[in-house]
Amino acid sequence: MNKRKSCATYLYQDSLARRMKELGVSRSELATMTGLSPSTVLTACNGRPVSVRTIAKILEHLQVDSSEEDDFWGIDPV
């Protein structure tokens, strides 16, 4: 179970970092845009668990639409 959780964490961290780089958004800018605290954004960027609400805010502000969410999170469609 821990191995699987670690894999998902790295996929999320990599996807978030890639999207931020594509858009030219820093962690502090993301914190300002989302209204989240800088420490919460840092937690998300480090691949640690964050709430669904936090993930929704990040997705909204990084302009990830529902059609590309699976690719963003590294999820293979079933």
Regions from the PLM with identified roles:
Residues 1-29:
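A short, Lys/Arg-rich alpha-helix, primarily the initiator
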Residues 15, 26, 51-54, 68:
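Residues that mark the N-terminal boundary/hinge immediately upstream of a DNA-recognition element
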Residues 18, 32, 43, 57, ...:
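DNA-binding alpha-helical recognition surfaces that contact promoter or target DNA
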Residues 22-43:
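Short alpha-helical DNA-recognition segment
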Residues 37, 48, 62, 76:
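The DNA-recognition helices of helix-turn-helix-type DNA-binding domains
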Residues 43, 47-60:
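Short, basic-rich loop-to-helix N-cap that marks the start of a DNA-contacting helix
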Residues 63-78:
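Short C-terminal boundary/hinge segments that cap the last helix of small helical domains
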